[in-house]
Amino acid sequence: MPCACNRNNWRKWIRPLLILLYALAILVTVPVCIWEFQKLKVGIHTKVWFIAGIFLLLTIPVSMCGILQHLVHYTQPELQKPIIRILWMVPIYSLDSWVALKYPKIAIYVDTWRECYEAYVIYNFMIFLTNYLTIRFPNLMLHLEAKDQQNHLPPLCCCPPWAMGEMLLFRCKLGVLQYTVVRPITTVTSLVCEILGVYDEGNFSFSNAWTYLVILNNLSQLFAMYCLLLFYKVLKEELSPIQPVGKFLCVKLVVFVSFWQAVLIALLVKVGVISEKRTWEWQSAEAVATGLQDFIICIEMFFAAIAHHYTFSYKPYVHEAEEGPCFDSFLAMWDVSDIREDISEQVRRVGRTMRGYPKKKCFPGDPDHNEHSSLLSASSQDSSKPSSPVGLYQGFGQTITSQSPISIANLYEEILNEIPEEQQRLYSGQDITMDIPEEQPRHDTGQDVVHLPYRQELPYKNHYQDHIQTVTSRYLLSSPKPSDDIVIDFSDSPEGSDSSTDS
């Protein structure tokens, strides 16, 4: 039974419902803040937490408005699903920092999960770009192969360039994916080190675990951002309709600013600007540094929410006729099967590469072809040299160049293999002639005719296109006038077949 609140009905009450929930949240949080200020002694910690709460209340509605509009106008799941995941970064960052600011003892546990989502956002931005390109250019691998070779950007400009095509796309995605894996691992490691008492957050010293984890996270994050930047550099013109610069800056600034300001605050602790002499209600200088970081993030997220609202706008996706039923878009927001499949595919490909197995071949005409499959075999391509646009594929078409000379006998065998076994036995040893009529085929007496739909691509049509030099094959591979059928005649007369072959 269809949902009673589908189409436009549920869109009429979803906005008032969220406004009501937001009003209830304000009615709960404001009295709590007032109660805190009614205490006999209100310190700097409480005042900072209260100011951060004001920015939180301003940030949440701006972010949720953008998320809600995408859910209401959920017409392009391939693009809007990663956008919604990116938009969730701002409220998660803001709420997480506000809670950590109020309860400093659990800050290490709360902040680590925030940092894990940071890696998730970077990868979703890469998915957003690749999904857009796949929609716009179904043969994306061919398009990349035809472009001029792109050298590495500084500081990796001395490294051998990645071959244009599948290798470039695979390594860029893998470079972003590694941060999605490294960040959760370092997060769990930091929690274990905190329990063991060897983490010592905010203290630059080679005797604690925090310093090493910061260096590892920094290198992993920088390489992920480098891969994103290289990917944008190669496909700058193709990505221009979605204005990727603003989107890239929104993601990059939130991630980079939050990370590097944490490093800067840690340096202030190291040089003594933030010291044990004045910690207010915090227990140590490191706790002061963590609280300062959380407070700044609460303020920054308000401006980030405004930037995200306009940069990742819902307006390009407003198509009333294509909007889905109730809750489908909401449930799709939590579906991570695409990420799981993509990670599994990347892991399998890395495993095949390490074991020396050849990569899977998947041609553009393959119905199972999608962005998670390897679209072009690069096993015969030198990874240190740029690929040529002329080779396995000619231009952007689907012509496949054969690597060995072809004879008429081979063509005969290929055609015969496509004929049912009964007719193979019946006409074994006879010559085959081909005819493509301009009008409807005529069924002559004494001939057996096998009809193949004209629009069905023959298996040998492309494979031998550049090698068969007979009149018959040239006539077959030319562009005939539209007709319903291609007729393959099995003639009993040897003279007809000889004339066809000799010509």
From Swiss-Prot:
High-level lineage: Eukaryota, Metazoa, Chordata, Craniata, Vertebrata
Gene: Tmem184c
Organism, as annotated: Rattus norvegicus (Rat)
GO CC aspect terms: membrane
Localization per record: Membrane
Protein name: Transmembrane protein 184C
Keyword Membrane carried by entry: yes
Pfam families on file: Solute_trans_a
Chain segments carrying region Disordered: 358-391, 479-503
Purpose of the protein: Possible tumor suppressor which may play a role in cell growth.
